[in-house]
Design a protein with these regions (language model features):
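Iron-sulfur-cluster electron-transfer modules
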Residues: 1-142, 148-188
Length: 190
């Protein structure tokens, strides 16, 4: 990932992938992912349904023995995290803290992993911020940051998803936007 000559290899690989796909037929997996991730409600419904579908392959907090057609050939994932029993977004209405005289107002970008796999991290972050006088808002219209699409070479769809998320938060209502996912943060910042 790091080139001593200073060449940004990850970005170069993404651009080459994008170029190859623009000249030929896109793989079905890419087309499907682009469709699902650009339709937030569909994506979230599929994740919620996935909680039921993961039961046969769930072992503790991880999924095991996933069918190979679900994973790209170049990846050798042995274990993937299980989906949480309840997504952060489905708990927000009961969690939203009321902070009198907030020092700051923060818009929380959850990303898919934190929202659907590790909601407890977001809950702890919201509690911590509230204890320190920070008001937190959560735009339910947000979805995946789009990075998985970019990694598949779906640059246009990735940009569409990122722009949708940026529009979901009114910059006049928050002082900062916070995410616990470094990948989401760096992708949205670009």
């Amino acid at each position: 990932d790091v080139c001593v000559a200073g060449i940004d290899l990850p970005r170069l690989i993404k651009e080459v992938q994008n170029l190859i796909q623009s000249q030929g037929k896109r793989p079905l997996m890419n087309t499907s992912m682009a469709h699902v991730l650009t339709h937030r409600r569909l994506f979230h419904s599929l994740l919620r349904a996935g909680k039921l579908g993961q039961k046969p392959v769930q072992k503790g907090p991880y999924l095991r023995h996933l069918p190979h057609f679900l994973l790209a050939k170049e990846h050798d994932f042995k274990k993937l995290p299980s989906l949480a029993p309840k997504a952060f977004r489905d708990q927000w209405s009961k969690l939203e803290p009321q902070v009198s005289r907030p020092r700051y107002k923060v818009g929380l970008f959850t990303g898919c992993l934190q929202d659907f796999v590790y909601p407890e991290q977001l809950i702890q972050a919201v509690d911590f911020l509230a204890q320190h006088g920070v008001e937190v808002s959560f735009a339910r219209e947000q979805g995946c940051c789009g990075l998985p699409l970019l990694m598949l070479g779906e640059k246009e769809a990735a940009g569409d998803v990122a722009r949708h998320n940026i529009r979901a938060v009114d910059p006049n209502e928050v002082d900062f936007i916070l995410t616990l996912c470094a990948s989401c943060g760096s992708h949205l910042k670009e």
